[in-house]
Every structure is written in C-alpha cells, then in structure tokens.
C-alpha cells in the first residue's frame, strides 16, 4: 500500500521509520519531509497546512493511508477534509483535536468529568486575570489557550512576573490568537511523565511512558523549547501510578470525549505530574510527542499500520500493543541560540556513521539538502535527535551521548544532563 506522512520533524522521521518496517507498505510519501526522511520516503514540497494540495496529491497518487504527525493540521481539521474526500487518514477530527487546541476546553472537560488536574480559572480579559492574580498564591502558572509550539506556558514566581506574563500572553499577543483566552493554574510539584496512547474512541491502549526535558539549558534552566531530549520508559511511572491512571485518567478521558459527542480516534499524549497527592493531568496533546515518538516508536513491535487502522476502524480491542523490554534515550542536537535566534544552512558531517545501525538512530528534525542535492544542511532550531536503545536507561544514555560525537555542524548545541533523573530512581 501507499502511505503519506504529513510533517517535517524528528517525530515524522520516527513515524516514517516505523512505517518503512511494515511489510504491507510499498511506497511512502512525506509532505514536506526533510533530508533524513528522504532516505526512506519521497518528500513532496507541500506544507502541512495546505490541506487542498495534500488531498489532491493523495488522490492523484492513489495514497491508501495518511498519517498526520503535527498538531497544527490536526487542530485545523485536516482529518475532516481528508475524510470528506473518502480518504483514509489517522488522527482525531477537528472537534476532538480541540483537546489540545484549547487548554481552556481541556480543563473544563477534566473538571466536568472529575479527571484529576490542577485547580484553575479561565480568562478572556486581561483585566479580570490581573484582578484574580492580586490574591493568588505564588508560584502560579499561566497558559496560552491555543497552540504555541509547546512554548505557551509561563511559570511565575512573583506577582510582578505574573503581571508581566498576562501582558505578554493577552496584551502583546506573543503567541498570537492562542493568547485570546488564558488559563491560570495552580503550580504543581512533582515529577513530570509523558504517556503516549492509541485509542479508537472506545478502547485505549498505552504505549509507554517517557520523560521530557523542556528547558534549553542544563539544570532545567533557560527558556522552554519543544523538547531537548527524552528517555523511555520513566522509572517513576510505577505499577501503582499506572493502575491509578488507568482507573481515573486514561479511559475517563476517552469516555468524556465520547460523551461530549467528540469521539477521539488517534493518539492521546498525556502530560502528567506525579504530585504528592497522586498523578494529575498537566496537558493533553493529540499526536505523538516530539521527541517522545523518537524514544517510544523504535521499541514498538507491532506493525504501526495495523495499529493505526484499528484506531480508525474501531477494532483496537482486538489487538495487543507490544514493546521491546528495552530503554531508549534521545539527545537533541540543536542550533546554538535556540529557541530564540540561531543560524541555519550550515553543513552537517558524520551522518553516515549511523548507517546500518539498529540500536542507534539519527532522527532528522531541522535539515534540508543544499543546492547540490547531496550535502545536508541545518534548517531549524532542533536539528537532529540522537537516539540509542539498550537493556537499561543508563546504558542507553551512555550510548546516545557517545553517538552525539559522530556528527558535527558549526553551531551544534545540546544539553549534557538528559536522563540525569535516571540516577535518582
């Protein structure tokens, strides 16, 4: 069959890598793709938000199945557009993708259906938000309601910081229309854990847990990024935590969406905080995380197409997700200066060192080909995701960091403490 993957990041490279393992596939397209994806798929110069062009391409090339990796097109309703044309596509419809598209919606949903989360208030007026903050307990969390590339969350330690945050989100519109509504949330302490799942709208099956590293600099300092590295599974996601989440969070979320007439088919990413009072939901995403996909998918034994189809067909209960009993660590190689200002278009060397390896992967995020069609250049803030698989987290971490030395580009930057928490488990 012919498969189209929509997106251009490390997550999409991981998805394409999994799709390429399927014996059912004879042709993969990726729109728009990147220089790494190009070794496995035919990259097509169509942007992820160009729905009409994507549909026309899928029809013209008789694409049998489309997988959408990114949040923007899902929240924008790409699945509805494909389905209206009779095309098979994996991902939630627009009315379900709101679970990530609006933080205010997701908070109200959790409140209504008693899904554990932090106390909060939603605001559409900066004046009301400022008035509320005058008497609020610090630290406090401000969240832009809409999509903000994973950067729309501010943790404020003082009232002054909180006031500045309201100005940034609601008045200066740092995140554009995403800040028209703002969520003010109590600050929760504990360990963060990400859990990826597949659901067909009735059944939900958990893939694996992972832990992200959002901040740009070592020691969790610096600005929020899309993610600087990851490890999976999380040693803090214990059997007890899993049992609690299965009872009060996972199925409850799927059932709540169905009860609201927003049946969810696709991937739900649960961002959890393991607080002293038990696990609580920090956020939902409606797609594979990035770089979570890079640490979870390489361990999946199932044919990804079988699982994705089961989600769409409502037959996920007939399938058992299976994962290798191994650990994975991903270290992101970024352009120095990310997430603010950084140079692009710099040549990358050493990529051939990863050829033929089955336990070390180099997932491309921000890369493109030079005019010569051969040289690979940097093309973004996050450039590569160096991922290693091993029997233990410590071995995987050592292997991943060793492999970061195999590749070079002029402004290569990484955190040196990805997976530090492994030592605290």
Residue ranges and their predicted role:
Residues 152, 156-293:
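Internal nucleotide-binding/catalytic subdomain
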Residues 20-21, 36-38, 60, 90, ...:
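Solvent-exposed alpha-helices and their adjacent loops that cap or buttress functional pockets
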Residues 1-94:
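ATP-binding N-terminal substructure of ATP-dependent carboxylate-amine bond-forming enzymes
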Residues 90-152:
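A conserved helix-loop-beta module that forms one wall/lid of the active-site cleft
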Residues 367, 371-373, 377-425:
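Generic C-terminus detector
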Residues 43-49, 121-125, 156:
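Short acidic-hydrophobic, aromatic-tinged amphipathic segments that line or gate anion-handling sites
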Residues 246-268, 285-359:
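Active-site "cap" helix and flanking loop/linker of ATP-utilizing ligase/carboxylase catalytic domains
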């Amino acid at each position: 069959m012919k498969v189209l993957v929509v997106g251009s990041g490390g997550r999409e490279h991981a998805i394409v890598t999994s799709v390429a393992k399927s014996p059912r596939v004879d042709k993969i397209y990726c729109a728009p793709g990147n220089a790494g994806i190009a070794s496995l798929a035919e990259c097509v110069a169509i942007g992820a938000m160009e729905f009409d062009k994507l549909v026309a391409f899928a029809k013209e090339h008789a694409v049998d199945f489309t997988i959408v990796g990114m949040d923007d097109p899902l929240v924008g309703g790409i699945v509805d557009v494909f389905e209206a044309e009779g095309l098979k596509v994996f991902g939630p419809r627009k009315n379900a993708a709101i679970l990530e598209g609006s933080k205010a919606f997701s908070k109200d949903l959790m409140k209504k259906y008693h899904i554990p989360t932090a106390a909060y208030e939603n605001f559409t007026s900066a004046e009301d938000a400022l008035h509320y903050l005058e008497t609020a307990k610090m630290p406090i969390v401000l969240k832009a309601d809409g999509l903000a590339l994973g950067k729309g969350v501010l943790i404020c330690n003082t009232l002054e910081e909180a006031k500045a945050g309201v100005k940034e989100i609601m008045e200066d519109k740092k995140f554009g229309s995403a800040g028209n509504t703002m969520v003010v949330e109590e600050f929760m302490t504990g360990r963060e854990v990400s859990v990826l799942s597949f659901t067909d709208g009735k059944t939900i099956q958990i893939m694996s847990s992972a832990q992200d590293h959002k901040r740009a600099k070592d020691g969790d300092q610096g600005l929020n990024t899309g993610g600087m590295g990851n490890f999976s599974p999380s040693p803090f996601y214990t059997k007890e935590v899993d049992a609690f989440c299965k009872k009060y969070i996972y199925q409850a979320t799927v059932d709540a969406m169905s009860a609201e007439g927003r049946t969810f088919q696709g991937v739900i990413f649960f961002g959890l905080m393991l607080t002293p009072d038990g696990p609580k939901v920090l956020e939902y995403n409606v797609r594979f995380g990035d770089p979570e996909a890079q640490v979870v998918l390489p361990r999946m034994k199932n044919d990804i197409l079988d699982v994705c189809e089961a989600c769409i067909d409502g037959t996920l209960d007939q399938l058992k997700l299976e994962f290798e009993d191994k650990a994975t660590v991903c270290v992101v190689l970024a352009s120095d200066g990310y997430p603010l200002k950084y140079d692009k278009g710099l040549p990358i060397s050493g990529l051939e060192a990863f050829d033929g390896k089955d336990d070390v992967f180099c997932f491309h995020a921000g890369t493109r080909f030079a005019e010569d069609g051969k040289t690979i250049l940097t093309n973004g803030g996050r450039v590569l995701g160096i991922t290693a698989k091993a029997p233990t987290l410590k071995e995987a971490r050592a292997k991943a960091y060793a492999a970061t030395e195999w590749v070079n580009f002029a402004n290569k930057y990484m955190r040196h403490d990805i997976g530090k928490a492994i030592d605290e488990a």
